[in-house]
Amino acid sequence: MIDWITSQGHDIFGMYWTPLWILIRAVLIVVPVLLCVAYLILWERKLIGWMHVRIGPNRVGPLGLLQPIADVLKLLLKEVMFPSQINRGMYLVAPLMVLMPAVAVWAVIPFQAEVVMADINAGLLYVMAISSVGVYGVILAGWASNSKYAFIGAMRAAAQMVSYEIAMGFALVTVLMVSGSLNLSHIVNAQNTGYFANMGLNLLSWNWLPLLPMFGVYFISGVAETNRHPFDVVEGESEIVAGHMIEYSGMTFALFFLAEYINMIIISTMTSLMFLGGWAPPFSSALTNAIPGFFWLVIKVFLLLSVFIWIRASFPRYRYDQIMRLGWKIFIPLTVAWLIIVAIWIKSPWNIWH
């Protein structure tokens, strides 16, 4: 289908087709991601409401389904305030520095077999590199706002993200070791081969089972990387109000929230691709194999996003020193130890991967 569209496009548009096709694919990715963010916020409010024995948003549209549109209109119509002592240029650049890396990551994320904007061999490395840039926007926002609260939040963000990126990096290195590739599609395909996969038990063939500690470390570190509860000391409401976002309003404020929720979806998607078999069904049969792979990936991402929300509703915020201790004294030693175990496992006669 894609090959047919490409050939027809070349025939109709000639030399202009290549940039036009890139633009079309970008729009086809970005627009659904933005819609997912809008309704992820609604799902979060609904789910937390049910956990609190409340109904949640139900006034705008049937069952509250138009609430995200009302929220967007409210933020669009709000005035963007500029405090007098800010560095105006840096102040405006900071939200874009947080948002753009979150959007750029989607260029290499496959949605099912051969459905990816750029199927590059260094896809995993690209995701790790691009996703680490967003913290500079947070630091810039804290500095440019010329506010003590904002600056404290920015410094917390810098320390927290550096701490947990190391553990996340080691977790992804083990995935690289067992799959033998940096290509995200190849990593997914590598999980769906072997003894259990041949029996139709794909669920037991995925990386979550042999790499269980890394699976837990990666997902929990992802919660910390996105500054979500209980790791949200960067914007701890009871301490520093909104942290690095305290001097922002209107759409500039909304861009930070947009980036946060896009990053939540990215972490859930990457966890699904790295550890949960990506677009593969949990059990292989004529019925499950007939269902498009994109459907299975969406289900896995949705369940992981619901875990994000469940964690927010269930756990109190950690102290800053507890967050640092978890990252440096527990996660990093654990990932290094499991990295060594996996390396020995791969070289042993009991190697289950190659």
Swiss-Prot record:
Keywords assigned: Cell inner membrane, Cell membrane, Membrane, NAD, Quinone, Translocase, Transmembrane, Transmembrane helix, Ubiquinone
Cellular component terms per the entry's GO annotation: plasma membrane
Gene Ontology biological-process entries: aerobic respiration
Localization: Cell inner membrane
Keyword hit for Transmembrane helix: yes
Transmembrane segments: 22-42, 91-111, 124-144, 162-182, 203-223, 250-270, 291-311, 326-346
EC id: 7.1.1.-
Catalytic activity: a quinone + NADH + 5 H(+)(in) = a quinol + NAD(+) + 4 H(+)(out)
Source taxon at top rank: Bacteria
Keyword Lyase: no
Main location: membrane
NCBIfam families the UniProt entry points to: PRK06076.1-2 (NF004741), PRK06076.1-3 (NF004742), PRK06076.1-6 (NF004745)
Family under the similarity heading: Belongs to the complex I subunit 1 family.
Protein name, as recorded: NADH-quinone oxidoreductase subunit H
